[in-house]
Amino acid sequence: MTQDEMKKAAGWAALKYVEKDSIVGVGTGSTVNHFIDALATMKADIEGAVSSSEASTQKMKALGIPVYDLNSVDKLSVYVDGADEINGHMDMIKGGGAALTREKIVAAVAEKFVCIVDNTKQVDILGKFPLPVEVIPMARSYVARELVKLGGDPVYREGVVTDNGNVILDVYNLKIINPKELEEKINAIVGVVTNGLFAKRGADVLLVGTPEGVKTFTA
């Protein structure tokens, strides 16, 4: 089974967490694209979706799934999204696709976070994948200096502007032993919008595509 086939299996497995007549929170990325394809098969049974990125919004609209503004929605029963890394405590690094802030906002609203990944994303310790930090453009150099003080090697992701008009610093060489603490420390730096650690709001359910099929883990 190829990596993409494992992603597809995880994406389709998430359908069982979608409630009838609900509005579904939808994340961003290659695994989520498979979930969107799956969601389109039951679009008549749901009210619609809230999206965490322009890319996912366009894909859903093209498939005929109604997309709502989060401000017009009182609650989301479920949010389905991928991860760049996830540990055994359901803490994640996300934001490889630069949609981390909107992903974090939608995740905060949702009652349940279902994370869908292939088995290459499971790790014991977070940090091998560079940690994305979304930054107000004028604060980029200052934030980079502060991130160095925290032990990281920040690299400006050139040519990338987020959906919110900000820039991304990817922080390398972090061995993240206490994800919640580091998430709070980075978010406390003036000029940081948010960072890609999802530890304060981790996943509730993890669906992992493996060569043997989809494995389910719960927090």
Swiss-Prot record:
UniProt entry keywords in alphabetical sequence: Isomerase
- Pathway linked to the protein: Carbohydrate degradation; pentose phosphate pathway; D-ribose 5-phosphate from D-ribulose 5-phosphate (non-oxidative stage): step 1/1
Q: Which residues form a coiled coil?
A: none
Under the heading Gene3D superfamilies, the entry gives: 3.30.70.260, 3.40.50.1360
Q: Which GO terms describe its molecular function?
A: ribose-5-phosphate isomerase activity
A GO BP annotation: D-ribose metabolic process
Does the keyword Zinc feature in the UniProt annotation? Answer: no
List the SUPFAM superfamilies hit by this protein, alphabetically.
Answer: D-ribose-5-phosphate isomerase (RpiA), lid domain (SSF75445), NagB/RpiA/CoA transferase-like (SSF100950)
For this protein, the Enzyme Commission number is: 5.3.1.6
Q: Which reaction does it catalyse?
A: aldehydo-D-ribose 5-phosphate = D-ribulose 5-phosphate
- Gene Ontology CC: one annotated term: cytosol
Locate the residues binding substrate: 28-31, 81-84, 94-97, 121
Q: Short name of one Pfam family for this protein?
A: Rib_5-P_isom_A
Active site at which residues? 103
State the CDD domains in the record.
RPI_A (cd01398)
InterPro entries per UniProt: NagB/RpiA_transferase-like, Ribose5P_isomerase_typA_subgr, Ribose5P_isomerase_type_A
Name the family: Belongs to the ribose 5-phosphate isomerase family.
Role of this protein: Catalyzes the reversible conversion of ribose-5-phosphate to ribulose 5-phosphate.
State the oligomer form and interacting partners.
Homodimer.
- HAMAP family documented for this protein: Rib_5P_isom_A
Report what the protein is called. Ribose-5-phosphate isomerase A
